[in-house]
Amino acid sequence: MNPQASLDRLAQRLSDAENLFKKVRVLVDLESAPLSLRSLSDPVRIASFLNTLSDRGNEYLAFIRHRPAFYLLRVASFGEQVPLGAGDLQGAVGLLTSAVRAFKDLKPPPEGTPAPANNLLENSNILTRLSQFIAHLRSLDLSQPVTFTPPASLVTLRCIEEITFSFWHAHWTAPPEVSLPKPNPQSKLERWLALSYAAALGAARDNAPKHRRELRALAKSLLTTERDLFAPVSVVTETSLTLPLAKERAREIFSMVDDALPGDAAARGAPVLGFRDADLNAASPEYVFLYEHVFEALLHDQTYGCARRTVEAFLERCLKFLVNLGSYVQTACSNKSHLSPPEIEGVRAAFHACGLTREACHTFSTMLAIAPAGGAASRLKHLHATVQHLEQITVFGRHFYECLRRCSPTSISHRLVREVLRTAQVEQNSATPWTAGAAEGSALGWPVHSYLRIFLPRPPEDDLAATFKAASESNFMKSLIGVSVKRDWDLNKFYVLSKKAPGGGGNGEGGSGGGNGGAGTVSRKQVRKFCEGLNPGDADYALEVVQSKYFAPEFARAVLLPELEAMLRGRVRRHVMLFRLRWLVLFAFEDAAGLAHIRRPLTLAYFQLTEIFGQGGVGSGAGAAGGGDGGALGNLLDHFHEAWTAARELVPEAGGEVPHELLTNIYRSLHAPAAREQLAAAAAFLKEIKPLVEGTWNMMRIASVLCHARYNYLSASGHLRVPFGEKPGYVDVPVPVFKETVKIMESSLHETLVILSQACQDLQRFYAACLGILDQNQFLATHPVQLDLSEPDFQAVKETLLGCLRRYREVASLAAGSCCFSLTRHFGALFDPPLITEAVVRKVLEFSEERDTTDAFIESLQQPIAKVEEEDWDDAPPKHALNDYDLTALREINESFPLPKQHGNNPPETTPSIKLSYTDSVNVSQITLDWEKFLRTSYIPQDAITSEFSHITVKKLEQSITGSF
């Protein structure tokens, strides 16, 4: 609809209406298809609309003519996506101002009425209150807490709710003015993190970052004087895929310095941001959520060489802060059942002060979801508990910010916040059946949906009651207000009161004759004949007939129940059904006796069907996950059941149970797309992980062989002799090639787990949506109107999704516990620095008996005290050896991996070693060994000690000294 012509079109449709019924039908449609507010800025258009309402015998039309401001603004909308953007708020206020001016300029002004001059809904009162409200909106400072609510006379106006919601939304989405903790001046890393966070908050407030120059200077200092803070990708076993936060943090620092990295090197070759003992010791726990790259590394078992006690002390400080933060949140949110702005402001300020923004909640949630199971959490003290509290707070924070964006004292927020609460509850329940450690329930300790009730606005019952009472001149208008309050606020009070029309004992809606007019002049037979001759769309009736005490039961028997049965059995098409339902609501709407209690649920059913048919099927998002109350379909069942029951009370002998064919078809049309989408997601997940899992199994098996194989180290050539084949054979692998292969295998497994976890996250959203529909179905299954819920079979869909999630968890658990997951740790000796450095070797080569002593060397040499029993290498086949397939796979991983050599081939050439004898010139006896007898050596300490160093033998030392360099 063209916004500028919408009121013109409405006036034209009213002019074309041939009778009262058709006029009212046009007006009732505004309840579900609102009018554009922009078209109310012209008094000429408003006057043209009022001129079409010339039927002076109807109370509803008279109400509209006398109170056009209330009526038109009640059904007017800004016509834009709500909430309005912050930049559109002043334009929206301008539209309201133009509408007020247009109503004030109406010539002639609306007719006077017998109502008191101070009637709440009078034009003058509405326009005065609206002008005051506009002035208040213009004076608002959105950086300060907002507490305003619409005035009593404006609470039911759609456009007022929309602009109220938009102003509150603008306040909540702007960062609060908070005092950030002072960063530790001794830590350049923390100063950078804190300043960059403060700059981001300033940019969000449309302010230039105050510390831009200091940030640039800090970045240069970090890159020049703190180079060891950055870990090259070639050093760590993780990659930018498994450490994306560390990579992104490093990129942010490099980007502050012009030409820090040429071309696209920043994306490919930049290091990751690490940390050192000094950084962890200086870290302030108040900034725990700015250190996401630290937690990311710890969860991937990467400590960058930091001392264990340093890491654990850092975790202990963070844990204490998180416990205190959680206690504050619980205190602020417990025992609150309705909207509590002060508590919301306090929690928001506390979150922003420690860096827990909406983006940080999503960052931590994703990081914790893709973190490998087990690993460091079982080795580092306090890490498991800290991760539990991080998960608990960030899960709550994610839903907190979702509610915050929807928070206001309006029915719009009431509906949206309830959806978030239901989604939070479903998501919380969806994690328990399949995730690891579900029994511990880290994020399940808080009743998140209960704490979020601080966002749920309370219905303004007193204001609604005043509005309802002020509309007493038209029972039909009161009925529409009661219906809208029921629909918007889920409040039954005024919906029930609207059934009790004055003077009719609940059986009339005004008119001149109440419930008994014409009863003495019209027989039941005449009323029955009239009702049996009615067809949908008829508008003519005799007043004495519709006001007869026989009209309601005869109309219900001959018209209402047959029409309802035809609709509910699905015998009429959609547009025909809506037409007939609307006719049942509006036929003799203010004159007929005894039908009010039936027409009101039919009115709600009509609006609900219009909404459902307008939206089409629901997908797997929030709509599907929403609710334990049955959602839109549950409301529809309630309305039809109420109308059918009321009609049966008039005609006890007619009809049976409520037909369900239409409602079952609506259920299927609503949820069939979701079922297809969820099954497609499961199929896509299995298709995606199948090649990954196959490759993962093979890599894990090869890694197991490498871990359990026995190696010979050829020190002269720097090769590892790796067993190969069932027959005694081997592959001589250069140590650098072997190390690179091991690193690639481990990082590939970690990357595969990240990809699987990301796919699992998507699947879990579908699983949560499926649980939401099943939760809704539990309500529908207990409803008096019994639907056929067998198709789609969401129980089968749930089992399919759950099977996929369990399969992922099984794969992830096995992978995390495999040799491949920690392959570099198993071969840690290869990655350690050499025990004898180049400087020591030079001292050995340049040794002078007159100048130097050999104490340091002799102390490291011990006489072997035992012989290690071993199987003969030449004769016995190795228990763990690579096969041809393994070798092919290893060469695909690292093309430098060499080909095998069968036993008996020429070994690598080595330089003959020259055995030297030690003299007693330093008063040390010569060590003599039979090297033919002692094929291998081992060192057994007298006391149990833990050493990260490898021992050397005399033979190896001789080879190192006399070999080629």
From Swiss-Prot:
Where found?
A: Virion tegument; Host cytoplasm; Host nucleus; Host Golgi apparatus, Host trans-Golgi network
Please state the protein's primary subcellular location: virion
Q: Give the start-end ranges of region Interaction with large tegument protein.
A: 489-965
Mention any one GO cellular component term assigned to this protein in its UniProt record. host cell nucleus
Q: Give the transmembrane ranges.
A: none
Q: Which InterPro entries match?
A: Herpes_U30 (IPR007611), HSV_ITP (IPR034738)
- Signal sequence residues: none
Q: Which UniProt keywords apply?
A: Host cytoplasm, Host Golgi apparatus, Host nucleus, Virion, Virion tegument
- Domain of life according to the entry: Viruses
Record-level GO BP terms: virion assembly
Role played: Plays an essential role in cytoplasmic secondary envelopment during viral egress. Interacts with the capsid via the large tegument protein/LTP and participates in its transport to the host trans-Golgi network (TGN) where secondary envelopment occurs. Modulates tegumentation and capsid accumulation at the viral assembly complex.
Share what the entry says about its subunit structure, partners included.
Interacts (via C-terminus) with the large tegument protein/LTP (via N-terminus).
To which protein family does this belong? Belongs to the herpesviridae inner tegument protein family.
Q: What is this protein called?
A: Inner tegument protein
Name the source organism: Equine herpesvirus 2 (strain 86/87) (EHV-2)
Q: Which gene encodes it?
A: 63
